[in-house]
């Protein structure tokens, strides 16, 4: 039996690249995308299921538990990222709470791995080149919410 992966944000800046890599390795994918987002995901043979929602971050842990039934791994790339607005937006708190609900639902559904994708903004950028040892120093709300998840 092959492993099943749920990818959020599959049409976004980072998620699109993650999707390409997973599809190239014949991973069975369920993708969760924002309703109304035009894409050709359904036509990709690696995609088993497309979950569309007007707001993935408004879903409850119970909803996620049901949606994640049979999923082995969640790769969470979705986040509010409107250019020029996202770093200071209070919508980051909605993303934080929604991500926690998703993680709780994943745990209840028996998901074995949950990977939340971050960015460089969580780190102390005064250290120059970033590495896994670079200390966290999230300054804008976006970075704080990402670091909290």
Enumerate the predicted regions with their spans.
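Active-site Tyr-X1-5-Lys
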Residues: 139-149
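N-terminal Rossmann-fold cofactor-binding loop
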Residues: 32-37
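Conserved catalytic-core motifs of eukaryotic protein kinase domains, centered on the activation segment
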Residues: 42, 83-91, 125-129
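Conserved Rossmann-fold NAD(P)-dependent oxidoreductase catalytic core, especially the SDR/UDP-sugar
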Residues: 76, 100-141
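Structural motif
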Residues: 4, 72-73, 113
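Short, conserved SAM-binding/catalytic segment
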Residues: 38-48
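NAD(P)H-binding glycine-rich loop region in Rossmannoid oxidoreductase-like domains
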Residues: 52-97, 105
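N-terminal Rossmann NAD(P)H-binding glycine-rich loop of SDR-like oxidoreductase domains
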Residues: 3-25
């Amino acid at each position: 039996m092959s492993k099943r992966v749920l990818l959020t944000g599959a049409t976004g800046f980072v998620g699109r690249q993650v999707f390409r890599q997973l599809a190239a390795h014949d991973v069975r994918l369920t993708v969760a995308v924002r309703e109304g987002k035009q894409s050709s995901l359904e036509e990709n043979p690696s995609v088993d299921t497309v979950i569309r929602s007007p707001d993935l971050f408004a879903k409850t842990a119970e909803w996620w538990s049901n949606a994640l039934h049979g999923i082995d791994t969640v790769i969470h790339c979705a986040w509010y990222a409107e250019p020029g607005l996202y770093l200071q937006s209070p919508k980051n708190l909605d993303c934080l709470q929604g991500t926690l609900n998703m993680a709780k639902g994943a745990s209840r559904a028996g998901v074995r791995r949950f990977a939340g994708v971050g960015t460089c903004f969580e780190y102390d950028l005064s250290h120059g080149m970033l590495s896994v040892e670079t200390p966290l120093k999230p300054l804008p709300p976006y970075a704080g919410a990402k670091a909290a998840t």
